[in-house]
């Protein structure tokens, strides 16, 4: 990825930051991004965290910006905290009161979201095998995409921000659905108990995450999302830099 400020995408990010867009809420951003105040760029080797606020733990030890996150680690956050970090080709924003485990050998194979809220962008798997996300009520197959998930015992919220996901209910493995999304097209709830219409997978609104956040964490792994940040228009597959 080039650091050239003439890159229109990075130039736009710089303008938003220097104009105080984060602080003024122009983009209606959560505190996760408002508090950063720095331009994202490809993280160097050996670096995991881009931003930490509040109590962030890795394997039950208090994390700092120098903490390295690797496969088979557990990352958790306290009330009002957040963590923005990278593992390999994948990047995450873990919001407050959340806990996740990263499973895998050389690359991530499974993300377990025990509780809370997680925004993720995933690179394409070199072994061509799908990565899985697991929550209390859902199993999600993922290939090179961006997703936002909220997990609690009663339901899982999932927005396939772009790309393809395969949803499966943990309550009934026969309940499955493939989502093909260009730009937050088909958010879903995966329920612990059937809805009034007897459904375990139901439509949902887009909530609690933004295109600016997706752009920021894609930057950390040297990619750009498949939409125009200024207008949100779909413009094709993601590009690596």
Predicted regions and their residues:
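Secretory targeting signals
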Residues: 1-11
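Flexible, surface-exposed loop/linker segments and immediately adjacent secondary-structure boundaries
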Residues: 12, 16-20, 27, 32-70, ...
């Amino acid at each position: 990825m080039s650091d050239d400020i003439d890159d229109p995408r990075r130039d736009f990010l710089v303008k938003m930051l220097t104009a105080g867009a984060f602080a003024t809420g122009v983009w209606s951003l959560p505190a996760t991004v408002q508090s950063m105040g720095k331009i994202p760029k490809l993280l160097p080797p050996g670096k995991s965290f881009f931003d930490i606020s509040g109590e962030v733990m890795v394997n039950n030890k208090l994390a700092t910006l120098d903490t390295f996150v690797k496969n088979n680690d557990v990352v958790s956050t306290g009330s009002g905290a957040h963590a923005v970090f990278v593992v390999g080709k994948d990047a995450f924003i873990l919001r407050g009161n959340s806990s996740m485990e990263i499973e895998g050998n050389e690359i991530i194979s499974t993300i377990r979201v025990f509780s809370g809220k997680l925004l993720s962008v995933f690179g394409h798997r070199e072994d061509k095998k799908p990565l899985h996300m697991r929550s209390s009520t859902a199993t999600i197959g993922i290939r090179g995409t961006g997703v936002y998930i909220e997990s609690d015992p009663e339901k899982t919220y999932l927005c396939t921000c772009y790309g393809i996901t395969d949803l499966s209910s943990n309550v009934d493995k026969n309940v499955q659905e493939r989502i093909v999304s260009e730009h937050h097209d088909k958010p879903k709830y995966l329920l612990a108990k059937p809805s009034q219409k007897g459904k375990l997978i139901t439509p949902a609104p887009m909530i609690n995450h933004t295109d600016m956040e997706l752009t920021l964490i894609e930057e950390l792994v040297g990619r750009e999302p498949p939409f125009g940040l200024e207008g949100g228009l779909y413009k094709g597959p993601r590009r690596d830099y």
